[in-house]
């Protein structure tokens, strides 16, 4: 599990949109994940508490942004957020728990890694991990709630970077091009080379490729 976190000072006087702050004194963290669907690599989650005094322009669902915009916003989030935390669940955890429970585990780790204790976690999707604080699931939240948008960007960029590093070790799979998703290129490489230790053997295409070489 890789975790990064960042503390900052107190909040200023400006306000965020209503979706981010439900009541005076509420400290909201947005939570999102990247990497539920790929055949390889960890699932990564991020939690972000934005600073009302330092708004970040252009936040959106990471999937709606170009790679260049995600990288720029990643740097701004890291610089301006009150707190952020990025965590993951490993391929081994995905295979032993299943992808849903591994995703919930990564989200829990991200929230617990925050240096600022939130009072409410807003989670992208339709279910919440077990947390010690209140939580709210918001379908499509990564396009609606700025702190969830920020979390989606941190999770996506972090995971993409991880897969680029994996590509250096296993260039035959093309991880730098598809981030582990089941593209035709990736499936062809699986059939030709078989899976590596970073492939999720609980996922059917990987399991089938593994069976071919046994």
From Swiss-Prot:
- Xref: InterPro entries: RNase_HII (IPR022898), RNase_HII/HIII (IPR001352), RNase_HII/HIII_dom (IPR024567), RNaseH-like_sf (IPR012337), RNaseH_sf (IPR036397)
Provide the residue positions that the database annotates as binding a divalent metal cation: 32-33, 124
Q: Where in the cell is it found?
A: Cytoplasm
Q: Does the keyword Hydrolase apply?
A: yes
Q: According to the entry, what is the taxonomic lineage of the organism?
A: Bacteria, Pseudomonadati, Pseudomonadota, Betaproteobacteria, Burkholderiales
The name of this protein is Ribonuclease HII
Query: Ribosomal protein: is it a keyword of this entry?
Result: no
Query: EC number(s)?
Result: 3.1.26.4
Q: What class of enzyme is it?
A: hydrolase
Q: Name one GO molecular function term.
A: manganese ion binding
Which gene underlies this protein? rnhB
Taxonomically, the superkingdom here is Bacteria
**Textual note on the cofactor:** Manganese or magnesium. Binds 1 divalent metal ion per monomer in the absence of substrate. May bind a second metal ion after substrate binding.
> What PROSITE patterns does this protein's entry cite?
RNASE_H_2
Question: Which keywords appear in this protein's UniProt record, sorted alphabetically?
Answer: Cytoplasm, Endonuclease, Hydrolase, Manganese, Metal-binding, Nuclease
Task: Report one GO cellular component.
Answer: cytoplasm
The record lists the catalysed reaction(s) as: Endonucleolytic cleavage to 5'-phosphomonoester
GO biological process terms, semicolon-separated: DNA replication, removal of RNA primer; mismatch repair
What the record says about family reads:
Belongs to the RNase HII family.
């Amino acid at each position: 599990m890789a975790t990064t976190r960042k503390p900052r000072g107190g909040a200023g006087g400006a306000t965020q949109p209503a979706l981010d702050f439900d009541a005076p004194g509420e400290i909201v963290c947005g939570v999102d994940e990247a990497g539920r669907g790929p055949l390889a690599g960890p699932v990564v989650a991020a939690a972000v508490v934005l600073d009302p005094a330092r708004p970040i322009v252009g936040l959106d669902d990471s999937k709606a942004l170009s790679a260049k915009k995600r990288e720029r916003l990643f740097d701004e989030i890291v610089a301006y957020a009150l707190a952020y935390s990025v965590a993951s669940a490993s391929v081994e955890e995905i295979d032993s728990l299943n992808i849903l429970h591994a995703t919930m585990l990564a989200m829990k780790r991200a929230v617990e890694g925050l240096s600022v204790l939130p009072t409410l976690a807003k989670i992208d999707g339709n279910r919440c991990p077990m947390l010690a604080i209140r939580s709210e699931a918001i379908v499509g939240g990564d396009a609606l709630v700025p702190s969830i948008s920020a979390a989606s960007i941190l999770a996506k960029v972090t995971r993409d970077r991880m897969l680029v590093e994996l590509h250096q070790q296993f260039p035959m799979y093309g991880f730098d091009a598809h981030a582990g998703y089941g593209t035709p290129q990736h499936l062809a490489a699986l059939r030709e080379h078989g899976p590596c230790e970073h492939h999720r053997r609980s996922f059917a295409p990987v399991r089938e490729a593994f069976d071919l070489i046994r």
